[in-house]
């Protein structure tokens, strides 16, 4: 005589409730590094384009690659892609204007 009785207690079951976000921000656990790298990439690519500094253009490409690699799936893909394309265009335009090799900033 084998009876199958459910051993769980119905009064002890608590349904999971997701924590509410505080205000506009996603909370303290949200990683802001992709956003910071995106902004840095845009700033350095503009410096590379306007001031014709090759090291700024390369650093912008580096920042936008980090931003692309660490972005979440829920992030706006257009913003990340536009930052990446802006940094690539900064590198290309800086070498089209002056095809000489890059000199380090401390050597000039």
UniProtKB/Swiss-Prot annotation:
Keywords: Membrane, Transmembrane, Transmembrane helix. Pfam families: ASTER. The chain crosses the membrane at residues 80-96. It is a single-pass membrane protein. It is found in: Membrane. InterPro entries: ASTER. GO terms for molecular function: protein folding chaperone. One of its GO terms (biological process) is protein insertion into ER membrane. GO terms for cellular component: endoplasmic reticulum membrane. Residues 1-29 are annotated as: Disordered. Belongs to the Asterix family. This is Protein Asterix.
